[in-house]
């Protein structure tokens, strides 16, 4: 496997002028093959750092690149963009390898050389931030190389590929470059259109023509599994670390959807989870007719897709040693819709919590009542509310409702808003009727953000907005405040 040094910062116009580069150069930047001499890159960096103010010793090694895809498909290259981000990327399509090199000594030398050039340009030309090329993303040393992969790739795409892309025929199609589609999983044209096609990308004063081969779709599918795209900022999150980050976007902090199993793992102590009614499944009580797909077949397909039997998981577990009854809805299963089985499982959970004198947690994530079950799904609202009435008023026990995105419809109108303490996640979409339904029914525009957790909190709709990383500790403190203690602590007090 060959190793290449890729320096896209040479596209800075001022640097081209200093080094006598040709602005019409049709490549992404200087590339040198370090396959022959592994120490060559260190030597070049040293000579670059000690250059005088009007010359650049590395210009002798420049040559053009006609097809960047050749390097992406089976080679390794080191990248430093004009924003100051430096990183080494290894691609191996055949073996599905995509990783970042962990060479901190090389990073420090490489960055210092780029930053010294930037400071030199500031002094000589009087730049003070008005040049858009110098709005750099500084490397944050608190992240390891692997955790920094997302911001590096995103910075590279923004600065090199996604700035201004157009098809040679003249039609505008921004952000549709080969690398962007390969990482984001965008749609690829069919093979007959791909063969021999080309695209010109303008990157800050220079033109790059990228040839697309007929197997773009194959490459796209191979790398699609590596990333999760944020639905708020559209930033890319490396899937390998996404679960450890609790499905929170590293770019903007947005809380993305989370499966019920992941939420149980987040809240319940390991080895203490005891599920309830796992074998309870939905039938077709009203023989719902659908031209697209029968209701039973749809249930079966979601069961295979999610590994769940229904849109809620219920059970008993321990939260920091405190026994709790918990139900977690899963939006991935038919939009978390509430049918007869969901209502029955939650009702049984409440009754068991009342009998065993346990605090109750219900994590809501639902689109509302399930239309395929008609009035049977609507009656679950009254059934669950009746069970909660006995639990809260007669048994005097403690119920915490956690509203996640989205929580709408019948769940919002029933047990979602009946908690003694109502907690919402940041940025959660919480409503009775959705924005589209309201606008179509009333023919009025719903203000942006009027159904977001932050706005509703100001109106007093719930008690707390708690980020995921603090949720378990906040719940633990609430339970202790209401005289629910860990098992070992409770037994020691009795003695």
UniProtKB/Swiss-Prot annotation:
A zinc finger (C4-type) spans 230-252. One of its GO terms (molecular function) is ATP binding. Residues 188-208 are annotated as: Disordered. Its EC number is 2.1.3.15. It is found in: Plastid, Chloroplast stroma. Its cofactor is Zn(2+). It catalyses: N(6)-carboxybiotinyl-L-lysyl-[protein] + acetyl-CoA = N(6)-biotinyl-L-lysyl-[protein] + malonyl-CoA. Transmembrane segments: none annotated. One of its GO terms (biological process) is fatty acid biosynthetic process. Belongs to the AccD/PCCB family. Acetyl-CoA carboxylase is a heterohexamer composed of biotin carboxyl carrier protein, biotin carboxylase and 2 subunits each of ACCase subunit alpha and ACCase plastid-coded subunit beta (accD). Component of the acetyl coenzyme A carboxylase (ACC) complex. Biotin carboxylase (BC) catalyzes the carboxylation of biotin on its carrier protein (BCCP) and then the CO(2) group is transferred by the transcarboxylase to acetyl-CoA to form malonyl-CoA. HAMAP family: AcetylCoA_CT_beta. This is Acetyl-coenzyme A carboxylase carboxyl transferase subunit beta, chloroplastic. The lineage of its organism: Eukaryota, Viridiplantae, Streptophyta, Embryophyta, Tracheophyta. The gene is accD.
